[in-house]
Amino acid sequence: MAAWVKGGAADVDAAVEAAADLLAASRVPVLAGLSAEVSALRAAYRLAETLGASLDPVSGPSVYAELGALSAGGAMSTTRAETIGRADVILIVGNRPWDGELIAEIAAAAPSRGRAAGSERALLSLGGPQNGAIRHVAYAADAGGLTISLGHLRAFAKGHLAGEAAFADLAKRLFAAQYGVIVYDPEEVGELGAEMLQGLIRDLNESTRFFALTLADPFQGRAAVQLSAWTTGQAPRVGFGRHQPEHDSWRFDSARQIAAGEADAALWLASLPAPRPAWLGSLPTIAIVGEGSQEAAGETAEVVITVGVPGQSVGGALWNDRRGVIAYAEASDPAKTPAETETAAGVLTRIRDRLIEKGVSC
């Protein structure tokens, strides 16, 4: 595995030592990104506890939009398999659900189980790209965007607005469902939009059955939520600066901390692809990144260590969006994986061990 220290090539042992020295000299370190396999996430939380650092996943906007709605009023959710097998009416909100194969897979099937079995499936969209390749009824979003549109739709559904508007027709179609599903991306609609959609789903369930199918972010955010919950009892943005895990989604936003000058060192963990943060390199930083990624270069950070990519060069437990669970992903071609391939968990553990040897602790 390749490694760099201050732009120069180094072996992994030297890079681990440099990373430990950098973190030992910091007062308010941040561990960010967290786009990695579960074992690496676990190692990151252990390292943060040792350092007294805070953690912030790159998936934060999606995670907290969903968690905000959940904490405000709960959620009624379903799975991909249940949607394909049972739903006769599906409302697709926004643009992101049209990316990938989900909508095409839904459109290719008909309800085969439950009360809607044998019915024709109706696909409806609100504020989407009006994809002509898949037959559906499209409703344009208001000029104010998706959040305003969802507010108007819920008002028509509750009877607080009346008339012949398009949203009135959409509300009637939703109430006519035998088993309905709303598909949306929490980050795209935002916390207020997610809360509005869950409220609409509760309203619809007064007379029929309706659920949400929320899209997971592509950066292992849901795995981070689960691991943080069983490790700290809280959501992912936690800090260990006062010897115990404290959750604060605003205070431990890494971009805010770094912009405000609160953090004096950072560790960026991305064994899986993740968008590079604007702050990377603006303060002493360690980058643990997947081999072959754009960030696998000496200029990325003060210390750069490349590791195996889970599901490709190494195995690892990852969020499986199709199944809606954390599942183990084998290396795609283990025969081609060099024996010396480092894992993110292994590197983080070695850094923590060196810090403990140096007497560094929260």
UniProtKB/Swiss-Prot annotation:
Gene3D superfamilies assigned: TPP-binding domain
Name of this chain's protein: Formyltransferase/hydrolase complex Fhc subunit B
Q: Which organism is it from?
A: Methylorubrum extorquens (strain ATCC 14718 / DSM 1338 / JCM 2805 / NCIMB 9133 / AM1)
Q: Which residues form a coiled coil?
A: none
TM ranges = none
What biological function has been recorded for the protein in this entry? Involved in the transformation of 5-formyl tetrahydromethanopterin (5-formyl-H(4)MPT) to methanofuran (MFR) and formate via the formylmethanofuran (formyl-MFR).
**Where is it found, in Gene Ontology cellular component terms?**
cytoplasm
Q: Which cellular compartments is it found in? A: Cytoplasm
